[in-house]
């Protein structure tokens, strides 16, 4: 079972990693995955709903801890016959030995061409030290001691299976000692040049090869000092010798040169842009190290590499640490914004070492990036470890990969695990065995594992590729689906806008910064304005959210054909929390308003409506509707006009100025004469649907001093009474407009009630020119001590639909100031504007001159304003009860008017 599980894990890892160097290096000691070794129904680590976003830790070259056996055998058998197989090295052994002996071949070639014989083996006894100073003797002895140690290491490692790796470790140790010796004399030019000339002339061939290996290693780290040291010898050896030595010292040899050249990192999907964040202010005096250049060349295989350099004025004189960090963060942010402006659809990856990793994390919190890679993340700070409540890095939403060393002093693996559990973003951790803060493995680790630093860096790069491939694949699939969804939304007509809640689409505070590709405009105008949001042809004038109950679904099909006009919403979109708070205030205020109504009155659903935009909406709708061609003749022979739309907006709260007028106060000359008017419409083909838009008014008797009776509704015989209760399904809430500072209302949300009545049309044979048969009800506004308003009856040919909507108003709510000065609203109520609108409505028989020739509008908007605190009585329809007076109420300045009856 264990063998099968191990083979299956091997095959799965081979398919996942392909031909990566990490797979080749760790194939000998790969830890088995417990999920694969378990039963087939085992679930991964992330299947639990409470699983954190921290992925399991990946270990690189970490020796597994094996438990020591407590039982010690007294007699241990020793096998002296079995031959142990030679382990296969992790690199090309033949090519590694070739580059290893490169300096020895150069020395033999140079000494053979020389005229002088080679130095003997006892060359130290033949060295003439006459005239040497104390500094020269000390320097020469230190260099000689380092070269002798290297010679002993070469002899000890000769013939070993991993001799190239052991030789590389010994050469690095010798180069470090030579550098320390030269630094002891402060790299004095005369001393260093004298030392180099003396060593080249007196050293034996093996010792000279070791010396050139040390110089080759130091040339990659401190090229300027080595070039200054070799100036005098180049003039003596000639141009050919100097060129050969320069080519030899160009780059240090590496046992894994063949593996690195044949195993290049694979290109990441999506062609990302890789930003390398510097760990500090850059300076031309200190160029990048050879290892950083190697990293940059390897990362260039993944995508486009853009180093972000930070330059300080006057070499940073007078600049504090905090200012320097702010300058570094600002430089990276500006580079990210610049790339977003030029390549909005390109993924951006931030990679940083040590302090640069911290800068990259802070930038990811401020700007949108696809992923962050932190190499050598410093978890310990001056104020203690990271991960406190106020740590801004805990709010990261960008996927992040942490790569730390097992022996790191600034970041312990266990402390890093605790920090990862607190991060909300998807994160992963790679622990490099035997590595320090800069991910450099120790010499003991190199010897035991047979590794070099370049091989370890290459394996870390494979882990980075594995992490970024998953992140970019998911991001590419998510971004790639957005244009397809947008195209589908554009091609098909949105059937129901009420399913879309705009409040939930607004990003909450502290969320991840939006992608610049997601912020690109999807409409030709350059931005997705509010008009495009609610552009559904079936949306109601103030559509935002609708909750349809099971009892309302029966009439949904019929009523969906009625609401075909759309009014552009001008209110600002609120956030989700503001919408919740205002909706709670709306419910509270609605209960207060309902308590003021007398029992028995029909329920009114209050819908927020912006008082500032009512007049603009009316003008816009009338302008659009008047452009359409309608027949203005009400004669039977004329063509039937299209279905008009009557919108009644009851503003039951707010003391605003500039709102629309009311029906009962909009008097005409006929109305001033005292003639009652009966609004008569022809028998509508959509009368059944119309009844679905009107709620049934419950009749009740007068109760108390502040109640009144309302006339019950008389429904048409062709209409279904059950459909009358479906008006609530068409009433939807919108964002409320801002109330004025002087308003007397308790909440700015409860500002009005909007009824959309549509599909009122005439028969196909035309509108009737004669009065309707039967007694026509009359809409009468009785002059009462308290201000009140009533909406008249609407008669449709053979049937009558009577709806009484009681709203009590005050003088201030109608636009008149307490001082008695008329305002714009008050003037609009008395100048007969509503009568002019009513005269052009088809089906209102004999309201005004039939031969006026005016175009028939398809929309009439009636808005009644009131203040809930003043509601005391309700106006009856027809002849009825006289409500009681309220002492504190104010009288309207205009006298009550009666609409003339139909002839």
From Swiss-Prot:
Subcellular localization(s) per the UniProt record: Nucleus; Mitochondrion; Cytoplasm, Cytoskeleton, Spindle pole
GO process terms (BP): chromatin organization; mitotic spindle assembly; positive regulation of DNA-templated transcription; regulation of mitochondrial transcription
GO cellular component: histone acetyltransferase complex; mitochondrion; NSL complex; nucleoplasm; spindle pole
Coiled coil regions, renumbered to chain: none
Residues found modified as Phosphoserine: 523, 536, 540, 772
UniProt entry keywords in alphabetical sequence: Chromatin regulator, Cytoplasm, Cytoskeleton, Microtubule, Mitochondrion, Nucleus, Phosphoprotein
Bias kind Basic and acidic residues: ranges: 478-511
UniProt subunit comment: Component of the NSL complex at least composed of KAT8/MOF, KANSL1, KANSL2, KANSL3, MCRS1, PHF20, OGT1/OGT, WDR5 and HCFC1.
UniProt function note: Non-catalytic component of the NSL histone acetyltransferase complex, a multiprotein complex that mediates histone H4 acetylation at 'Lys-5'- and 'Lys-8' (H4K5ac and H4K8ac) at transcription start sites and promotes transcription initiation. The NSL complex also acts as a regulator of gene expression in mitochondria. Within the NSL complex, KANSL3 is required to promote KAT8 association with mitochondrial DNA. Required for transcription of intraciliary transport genes in both ciliated and non-ciliated cells.
Protein name from the UniProt record: KAT8 regulatory NSL complex subunit 3
Native species: Mus musculus
């Amino acid at each position: 079972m264990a063998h099968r599980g191990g083979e299956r894990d091997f095959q799965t890892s081979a398919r996942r990693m392909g031909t990566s160097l990490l797979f080749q290096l760790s194939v000998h000691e790969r830890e088995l995955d417990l999920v694969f070794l378990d039963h087939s129904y085992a679930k991964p680590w992330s299947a639990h709903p409470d699983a954190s976003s921290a992925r399991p830790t990946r270990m690189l070259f970490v020796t597994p801890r094996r438990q020591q056996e407590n039982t010690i055998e007294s007699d241990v058998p020793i096998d002296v016959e079995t031959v142990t197989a030679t382990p296969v090295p992790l690199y090309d052994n033949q090519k590694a030995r070739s580059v290893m002996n490169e300096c020895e071949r150069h020395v033999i070639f140079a000494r053979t061409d020389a005229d002088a014989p080679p130095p003997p083996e006892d060359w130290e006894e033949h060295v003439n030290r006459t005239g040497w100073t104390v500094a020269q003797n000390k320097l020469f002895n230190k260099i000689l001691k380092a070269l002798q140690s290297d010679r002993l290491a070469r002899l000890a490692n000769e013939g070993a299976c991993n001799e190239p790796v052991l030789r590389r470790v010994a050469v690095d140790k010798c180069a470090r000692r030579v550098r320390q010796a030269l630094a002891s004399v402060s790299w004095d030019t005369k001393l260093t040049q004298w030392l180099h000339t003396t060593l080249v002339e007196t050293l034996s061939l093996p010792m000279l090869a070791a010396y050139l290996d040390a110089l080759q290693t130091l040339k990659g780290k401190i090229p300027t000092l080595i070039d200054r040291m070799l100036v005098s010898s180049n003039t003596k050896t000639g141009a050919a010798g100097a060129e050969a030595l320069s080519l030899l010292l160009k780059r240090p040899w590496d046992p894994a040169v063949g593996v690195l050249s044949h195993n290049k990192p694979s290109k990441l999907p999506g062609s990302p842009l890789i930003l390398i964040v510097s760990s500090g202010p850059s300076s031309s005096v200190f160029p990048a190290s050879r290892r950083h250049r190697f990293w940059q060349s390897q990362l260039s295989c993944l995508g486009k590499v853009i180093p972000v350099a930070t330059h300080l004025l006057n070499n940073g004189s007078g600049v504090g640490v905090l200012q320097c960090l702010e300058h570094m963060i600002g430089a990276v942010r500006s580079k990210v914004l610049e790339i977003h402006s030029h390549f909005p659809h390109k993924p951006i990856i931030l990679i940083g070492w040590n302090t640069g990793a911290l800068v990259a994390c802070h930038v990811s919190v401020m700007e949108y990036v696809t992923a962050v890679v932190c190499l050598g993340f410093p978890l310990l700070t001056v104020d203690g470890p990271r991960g406190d409540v106020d740590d801004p890095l805990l709010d990261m939403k960008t996927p992040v990969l942490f790569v730390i060393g097992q022996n790191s002093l600034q970041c312990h693996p266990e402390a890093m695990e605790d920090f990862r559990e607190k991060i909300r973003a998807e994160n992963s951790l790679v622990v490099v065995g035997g590595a320090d803060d800069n991910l450099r493995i120790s010499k003991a680790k190199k010897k035991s594992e047979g590794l070099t630093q370049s091989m370890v860096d290459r394996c870390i790069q494979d882990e980075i590729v594995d992490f970024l491939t998953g992140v970019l694949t998911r991001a590419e699939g998510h971004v790639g689906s957005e244009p397809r969804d947008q195209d589908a939304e554009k091609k098909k007509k949105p059937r129901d806008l009420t399913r879309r809640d705009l409040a939930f689409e607004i990003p909450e505070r502290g969320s991840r910064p939006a992608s610049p590709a997601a912020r690109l405009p999807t409409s030709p105008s350059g931005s997705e304005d509010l008009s495009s949001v609610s552009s559904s042809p079936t949306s109601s004038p103030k559509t935002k959210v609708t909750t349809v109950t099971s009892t309302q679904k029966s009439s949904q099909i019929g009523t969906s054909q009625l609401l075909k006009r759309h009014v552009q919403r001008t209110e600002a979109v609120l956030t989700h929390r503001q919408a919740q708070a205002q909706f709670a205030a709306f419910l509270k205020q609605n209960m207060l308003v309902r308590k003021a109504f007398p029992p028995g009155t029909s329920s009114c659903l209050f819908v927020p409506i912006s008082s500032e935009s009512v007049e603009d909406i009316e003008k816009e709708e009338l302008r659009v509707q008047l452009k359409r061609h309608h027949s203005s003749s009400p004669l039977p022979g004329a063509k039937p006009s299209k279905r008009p739309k009557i919108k009644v907006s009851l503003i039951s709260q707010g003391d605003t100025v500039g709102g629309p007028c009311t029906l009962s106060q909009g008097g005409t000359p006929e109305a001033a004469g005292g003639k009652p008017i009966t609004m008569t419409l022809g028998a509508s083909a959509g009368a059944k649907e119309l009844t679905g838009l009107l709620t049934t008014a419950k009749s009740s008797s007068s109760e108390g001093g502040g109640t009144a009776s309302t006339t019950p509704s008389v429904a048409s015989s062709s209409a279904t009474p059950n459909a009358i209760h479906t008006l609530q399904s068409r009433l939807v809430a919108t964002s409320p407009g801002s109330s004025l500072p002087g308003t007397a209302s308790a909440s700015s949300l409860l500002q009005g009630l909007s009824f959309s009545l549509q599909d009122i049309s005439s028969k196909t044979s035309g509108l009737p020119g004669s009065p309707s048969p039967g007694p026509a009800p009359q809409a009468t506004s009785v002059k009462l001590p308290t201000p009140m308003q009533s909406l008249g009856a609407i008669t449709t040919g053979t049937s009558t639909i009577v709806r009484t909507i009681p709203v009590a108003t005050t003088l201030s709510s109608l636009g008149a100031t307490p001082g008695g000065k008329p305002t714009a609203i008050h003037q609009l109520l008395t100048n007969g504007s509503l009568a002019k609108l009513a005269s052009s409505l088809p089906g209102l028989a004999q309201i005004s001159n039939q031969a006026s020739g005016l175009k028939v509008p398809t929309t009439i908007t009636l808005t009644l304003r009131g203040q809930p605190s003043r509601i005391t009585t309700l106006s009856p329809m027809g002849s009825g009860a006289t409500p009681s007076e309220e002492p504190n109420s104010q009288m309207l300045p205009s006298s009550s008017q009666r609409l003339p009856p139909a002839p």
